[in-house]
């Protein structure tokens, strides 16, 4: 969902960290933040050849190919070992399949993603949003869509504001962990 023109700004802030971000006022007096030109260049040099962005909005309808095929090709062509797909609903828009409803399509897509991850020994992060107005205590059941999304995942992580946190803080919770078994870990 992140527009390609915001990607560099977003990732630069994440990589720079709070110690390398400065505050300034724009011509209207609003408070803004920036990474210095020197640090932006250092960051750009570091991630050059490491980050590849695919924006489906820039591809003509008849040129689109399966996102799964694109993912596999990028792994093979560039040696990528971490893939971030934001988000499941957008990814499904790129998949033409024979599945009848959206839950079947979600299940099939996640199964195929899981196979790609295992086949090439890569990490695939799939963003899936929470259900609206869901009140279950199980984080995995709060994922919007097919139950196969969390069933097939090796790890599920919830990201939220948290009621008792400072406004600038967020909560990460591991609710499923097939690698190490620890869940309900907060950080």
Model-derived segments and spans:
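Conserved inter-motif catalytic segment of the P-loop NTP-binding fold
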Residues: 2-99
């Amino acid at each position: 969902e992140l527009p390609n023109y915001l990607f560099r700004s977003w990732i630069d802030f994440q990589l720079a960290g709070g110690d390398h971000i400065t505050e300034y006022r724009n011509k209207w007096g609003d408070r803004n933040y920036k990474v210095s030109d020197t640090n932006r260049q250092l960051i750009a040099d570091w991630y050059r050849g490491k980050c590849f962005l695919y924006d489906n909005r820039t591809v003509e309808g008849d040129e689109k190919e399966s996102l799964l095929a694109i993912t596999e090709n990028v792994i093979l062509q560039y040696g990528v070992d971490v893939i971030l797909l934001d988000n499941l609903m957008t990814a499904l828009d790129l998949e033409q399949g024979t599945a009848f409803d959206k839950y079947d399509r979600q299940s099939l897509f996640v199964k195929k993603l899981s196979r790609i991850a295992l086949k090439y020994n890569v990490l695939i992060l799939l963003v899936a949003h929470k259900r609206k107005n869901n009140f279950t205590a199980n984080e995995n059941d709060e994922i919007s869509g097919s139950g196969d999304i969390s069933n097939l995942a090796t790890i599920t992580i919830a990201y939220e504001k948290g009621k008792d946190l400072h406004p600038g803080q967020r909560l990460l919770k591991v609710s499923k962990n097939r690698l190490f078994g620890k869940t309900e870990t907060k950080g």
